[in-house]
């Protein structure tokens, strides 16, 4: 995962440097790197920070031939904290670009604030649908994806496989809604239930009990990071493999596999390429 992150962050950094038309050759390029470094969600943010630091080491601490400073900040996966940090990065630190941002609800919280300040905003992960297409801004660039894309692949796969009905589950925030919207765009079978869980939830016993009662032939789940680890482990402990086939996006991936180990066996998923998969 580090190799993958380094390539991504190096690309982001290099692209950003090319757009700093208002930075003189003598100036230091300042990058505000906002990610989640605390709590259960810190598993992904720590990987992003490690990748950025390794990329800067490979680049000799420079971007576009200029000295560069990367300021890391912890958004705590809280929109209000993200807004405060964005304000600090823009007004106090006077960064040339804000990047990072894992969570789509945080990207939605800071998007207008950053882009309207004429600061470049580059997403390393979050790709909420409202800021794509007609909602795209000239000061925003995404180096990852638009949230709907990966689940669209799973929706098509399950439609082509002839799966007649499915139970849906996702966290109740922007990316969760985008994921299920993307899935339903290509899957045309029966939706038995569409369940939204709390963002950051760690106990899924109530949801698994309801799912067991519904006994769907297939279940499609988006639960990223630590949520995915907890969900998959509890799914296994509850013996849910005998109840329903599990299909996922970002629940079983390079971030969660080290913790899941054999608990991931049996889950099917669509995913962007990773050396871990």
Residue ranges, per PLM feature:
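Periplasmic-binding protein-like
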Residues: 33, 89, 93-102, 122-124, ...
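Sec/Tat signal peptide C-region and signal peptidase I cleavage site
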Residues: 5, 20-26
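Extracytoplasmic "Venus flytrap"
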Residues: 32-51, 73-80, 102-103, 169-177, ...
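Extracellular/periplasmic periplasmic-binding protein-like sensory domains
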Residues: 234-277
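Bacterial N-terminal signal peptides
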Residues: 13-21
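Extracellular/periplasmic Venus flytrap/periplasmic-binding protein
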Residues: 84, 129-132, 138-238, 277
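Beta-alpha junction/loop-to-helix N-cap segments that form part of ligand/metal-binding clefts
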Residues: 43-48, 58, 62-131, 143, ...
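Bacterial N-terminal signal peptides that target proteins for export
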Residues: 3-12
């Amino acid at each position: 995962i580090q190799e993958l992150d380094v390539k991504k962050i190096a690309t982001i950094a290099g692209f950003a440097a090319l757009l700093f038309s208002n930075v003189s050759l003598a100036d230091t390029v300042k990058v505000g790197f906002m990610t989640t470094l605390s709590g259960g969600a810190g598993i992904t943010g720590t990987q992003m920070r490690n990748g950025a630091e390794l990329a800067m080491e490979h680049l000799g601490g420079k971007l576009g031939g200029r000295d560069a400073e990367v300021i890391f900040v912890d958004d705590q996966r809280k929109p209000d904290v993200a807004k405060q940090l964005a304000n600090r990065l823009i007004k106090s630190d006077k960064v040339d670009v804000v990047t990072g941002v894992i969570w789509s609800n945080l990207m939605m919280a800071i998007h207008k604030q950053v882009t309207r300040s004429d600061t470049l905003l580059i997403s390393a992960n979050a790709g909420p649908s409202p800021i794509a297409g007609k909602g795209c801004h000239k000061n925003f660039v995404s180096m990852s994806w638009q949230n709907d894309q990966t689940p669209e692949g799973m929706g098509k796969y399950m439609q082509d496989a002839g799966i007649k009905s499915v139970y849906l589950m996702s966290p109740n925030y922007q990316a969760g809604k985008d994921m299920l919207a993307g899935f339903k765009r290509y899957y045309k079978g029966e939706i038995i239930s569409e369940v939204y869980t709390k963002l950051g939830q760690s106990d899924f016993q109530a949801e698994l009990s309801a799912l067991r009662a519904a006994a769907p032939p297939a279940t499609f789940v988006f639960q990223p990071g630590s949520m995915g680890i907890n969900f998959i482990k509890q799914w296994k402990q509850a013996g849910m493999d005998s109840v329903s086939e599990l299909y996922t996006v970002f629940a079983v991936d390079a971030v969660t596999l080290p913790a899941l180990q054999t608990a991931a066996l049996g889950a099917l998923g669509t995913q962007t390429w990773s050396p871990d998969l």
